[in-house]
Amino acid sequence: MQVTTRTMNKSKHIALVAHDNCKQDLLRWVKEFEDKLEDHTLYATGTTGHLLSKETGLKINCMISGPMGGDQQLGALISESKIDMMIFFWDPLNAVPHDPDVKALLRISAVWNVPVATNRASAKFMITSPLLAEEISIEIPDYEAYLAERIG
């Protein structure tokens, strides 16, 4: 697949997602890095976003709840280059009814080269990276070239 580049601004668009058993862990992480997160535009699936906003006061753009389509909404934003990175604390020990949506969200993140942290350690690496406060370019699929190849 051909690639092109897109620029992430200094202020990032960050998605925050957590399975039910991980919501408190994500909340603790958000509180720990609240000072860094407030400089960015935040998105979250519904239940997670409302919990984080209520407990921290951070402005969060809430989708609907993940099992009701919120994972799909975030995936759409990713495919439109409107999400720069995602913090997704998922529960590897318990299956969820909307597992296909979760897999789709992780797949679309990989397709569009969106960095994803899946636990406190990887999230800490991402949020403390000097790149967080820099304008950077990343490679993404060249959709126009992809479409041209498909339709000739």
Swiss-Prot record:
Protein family per UniProt: Belongs to the methylglyoxal synthase family.
Gene Ontology MF term list: methylglyoxal synthase activity
InterPro entries: Methylgl_synth, Methylglyoxal_synth_AS, MGS-like_dom, MGS-like_dom_sf
GO biological process: methylglyoxal biosynthetic process
Enzyme Commission code: 4.2.3.3
Keywords attached to this entry: Lyase
Top-tier EC class: lyase
Superkingdom as given in the UniProt entry: Bacteria
Domain MGS-like residues, every copy: 6-152
Encoding gene (name): mgsA
Positions of the catalytic residues: 71 (proton donor/acceptor)
Binding of substrate, residues: 19, 23, 45-48, 65-66, 98
Lyase recorded as keyword: yes
Keyword Lyase appears in the UniProt entry: yes
GO cellular component assignments: cytosol
Catalytic activity: dihydroxyacetone phosphate = methylglyoxal + phosphate
Protein name stated in the entry: Methylglyoxal synthase
Function: Catalyzes the formation of methylglyoxal from dihydroxyacetone phosphate.
